[in-house]
Amino acid sequence: MEAQSYCAKLLGELNEQRKRDFFCDCSIIVEGRIFKAHRNILFANSGYFRALLLHYIQDSGRHSTASLDIVTSDAFSTILDFLYSGKLDLCGENVIEVMSAASYLQMNEVVNFCKTYIRSSLDICRKMEKEAAVAAAMAAAAAAAAAAAHQIDSESPSSGLEGTSCGTKSFVSSPVDGEGSLDCTISSCDDCHPLELVAKDSQGSGVSDNDLCVVPRRVEPKVEFDVARVEVEADEQLQQYAAPLAHMEEGLPSNQALDLTYSSYHVKQFLEALLRNGAVQSKDDLDCHSSRGLEGRLEGPGVAMSSVMDVQNDWYREDAGDVLVVPIKLHRCPFCPYTAKQKGILKRHIRSHTGERPYPCETCGKRFTRQEHLRSHALSVHRSSRPIICKGCRRTFTSHLSQGLRRFGLCDSCTCVTDPQEEEDDLMPVNLSLVEASSESHEKSDTDDWPIYIESGEENDPTAEDSDDKPHIRPNLPAPETLT
């Protein structure tokens, strides 16, 4: 058996002990106010007090005192009453303070209660606002209806419907339709005003004239903006301008007729783009621009294109924020957001992603992504058609160079090549004075063939080498020979 009221009675007894300060073994000071409580209650409900009692209170037999600086006294009093009674006193003024205090004291149940209260309060406020808005709308509608009825009564004669002698026929309810629809036939009259008639169907049968409740009301014209209608009007205007242009072209020479056709096409293109972008001008503006363009065309063939440019400049000047976008086909990179106008530029850009180098050097095997890089490399590193001075022995070579000399600037003897036949073929020392003329002619031809030329001074200038390397290399080489 379980007693349902036992927990409530136990909490009531503990709350009475707290109020009378019976067996209270701890005190909490909040903003100068002292609150008496029991450790067991605080330990069981608050994670903050549980950690405080476990780690910081060593003397369990003495009276303990805790001080809270963040929590307000009113919020802590409300939370303490909830711990001993199970009832949380919340209102719109203290709900935020209580929720923040409960969050600091690690009391999740109180935090959830506060959140639920806030949601319900917001729902109630929204519901009240909706009801107030509906009531205000109904009051405004009633006031407007009363004002309209009063105005109609003051304007119309006392006879009611007889005053509006517009040839209005009787309204007959259709017995087939169960919704009380009316068939109204009104003769053409310029002085009558439209009336809104509300029919009340009595007992689902035929409707007599007495059963009709007539509520006259003046209907004001409603102005709506229809993009489709504006486009149709623009097309009609273009068609109207097309016929005069056709007659004008028949009486003009061929070149003038061609200019007029080209100009009318551009005007139509501008108008269509203007309508498509949403910046539709009024009918008067369109007539003004079109007439201005036609006047410019009638002046002569040389002024036709200038008139079109005038229309375009006027459009840009009036709508400075809108830009007429000309469709251009862009090539997109499949690896990144890069776009290019030419397919070759995109292909060269894709090589940076794939690592492709389609231009190899025939001499050293190095590969390049662009052909101009290969040409610059061949001119600056592999200069086989020009006299080169060996970095080791200082000999000048003009014939077919070996692989080592072309790549590293050293002759075969300096690169430890022992084949004498290759040395005789490759190494041909000549006098520098005899080679100057040929070198100048070679340089001129190179500059004509290769406009981009990069020369390294370290490979051609013998004075740029370090003097420390000469005694280590020259003892191992034969004596330099000179040609007379």
Swiss-Prot record:
<keyword id="KW-0238">DNA-binding</keyword>
<feature type="zinc finger region" description="C2H2-type 1">
    <location>
        <begin position="331"/>
        <end position="353"/>
    </location>
</feature>
<comment type="function">
    <text>May be involved in transcriptional regulation.</text>
</comment>
<feature type="compositionally biased region" description="Acidic residues">
    <location>
        <begin position="456"/>
        <end position="468"/>
    </location>
</feature>
<feature type="zinc finger region" description="C2H2-type 2">
    <location>
        <begin position="359"/>
        <end position="382"/>
    </location>
</feature>
<keyword id="KW-0862">Zinc</keyword>
<keyword id="KW-0804">Transcription</keyword>
<dbReference type="Pfam" id="PF00651">
    <property type="entry name" value="BTB"/>
</dbReference>
<dbReference type="InterPro" id="IPR013087">
    <property type="entry name" value="Znf_C2H2_type"/>
</dbReference>
<dbReference type="InterPro" id="IPR011333">
    <property type="entry name" value="SKP1/BTB/POZ_sf"/>
</dbReference>
<feature type="region of interest" description="Disordered">
    <location>
        <begin position="436"/>
        <end position="484"/>
    </location>
</feature>
<keyword id="KW-0479">Metal-binding</keyword>
<keyword id="KW-0805">Transcription regulation</keyword>
<keyword id="KW-0863">Zinc-finger</keyword>
<dbReference type="GO" id="GO:0003677">
    <property type="term" value="F:DNA binding"/>
</dbReference>
<feature type="domain" description="BTB">
    <location>
        <begin position="24"/>
        <end position="92"/>
    </location>
</feature>
<protein>
    <recommendedName>
        <fullName>Zinc finger and BTB domain-containing protein 8B</fullName>
    </recommendedName>
</protein>
<keyword id="KW-0677">Repeat</keyword>
<dbReference type="InterPro" id="IPR000210">
    <property type="entry name" value="BTB/POZ_dom"/>
</dbReference>
<dbReference type="Pfam" id="PF13465">
    <property type="entry name" value="zf-H2C2_2"/>
</dbReference>
<dbReference type="GO" id="GO:0005634">
    <property type="term" value="C:nucleus"/>
</dbReference>
<dbReference type="InterPro" id="IPR050457">
    <property type="entry name" value="ZnFinger_BTB_dom_contain"/>
</dbReference>
<keyword id="KW-0539">Nucleus</keyword>
<dbReference type="GO" id="GO:0008270">
    <property type="term" value="F:zinc ion binding"/>
</dbReference>
<dbReference type="InterPro" id="IPR036236">
    <property type="entry name" value="Znf_C2H2_sf"/>
</dbReference>
